[in-house]
UniProtKB/Swiss-Prot annotation:
InterPro entries from the UniProt entry: Ribosomal_uL16, Ribosomal_uL16_bact-type, Ribosomal_uL16_CS, Ribosomal_uL16_dom, Ribosomal_uL16_sf
Entry protein name: Large ribosomal subunit protein uL16
GO cellular component term, pick one: cytosolic large ribosomal subunit
SUPFAM superfamilies: Ribosomal protein L16p/L10e
Molecular function (Gene Ontology), one example: structural constituent of ribosome
Organism, scientific name: Pseudomonas fluorescens (strain Pf0-1)
Function description: Binds 23S rRNA and is also seen to make contacts with the A and possibly P site tRNAs.
Gene: rplP
């Protein structure tokens, strides 16, 4: 599972997930990409399950890049514990996603295979996504 090796602080405030993805919104490594259309959070488990779906579908052909990393800790209090007595322990890690953020990239496969693979991966994610191709400038 993806998570930072070490952080300056163990816990973070909830914060806001506003705006559009300015960084990481272009296809930079591969030929085809899966881009988010909606805003939300991706947990490390969701990122990993989508990656597995991608790699299983393309088999050995092609190279895959994961363009998101879960770097925000989400804390949770244990069940049946009263309120107060401090913030809960870190339960899992998330990546905050804005509309326009490229999530996965792939190259070395046909467009048809890439579309099928991204459709399988998108089914594992809680966000609306779209298929994009690299534009040559």
């Amino acid at each position: 599972m993806l998570q930072p090796k070490r952080t300056k602080f163990r816990k973070q405030m909830t914060g806001h997930n506003r705006g559009l993805a300015l960084r990481g919104s272009k296809v930079s490594f591969g030929e085809f990409a899966l881009k988010s259309v909606a805003r939300g959070r991706l947990t490390a488990r969701q990122i990993e399950s989508a990656r597995r779906a991608l790699t299983r579908h393309v088999k050995r052909g092609g190279k895959i890049w994961i363009r998101v990393f879960p770097d925000k800790p989400i804390s949770k209090k244990p069940l049946e514990v009263r309120m107060g007595k401090g913030k809960g322990n870190v339960e899992y890690w998330v990546a905050q996603i804005q509309p326009g953020k490229v999530l996965y990239e792939i190259e070395g496969v046909s467009e048809e295979l890439a579309r099928e693979a991204f459709a399988l991966a998108a089914a594992k994610l809680p966000l609306a996504t779209s298929f994009v191709k690299r534009t040559v400038m």
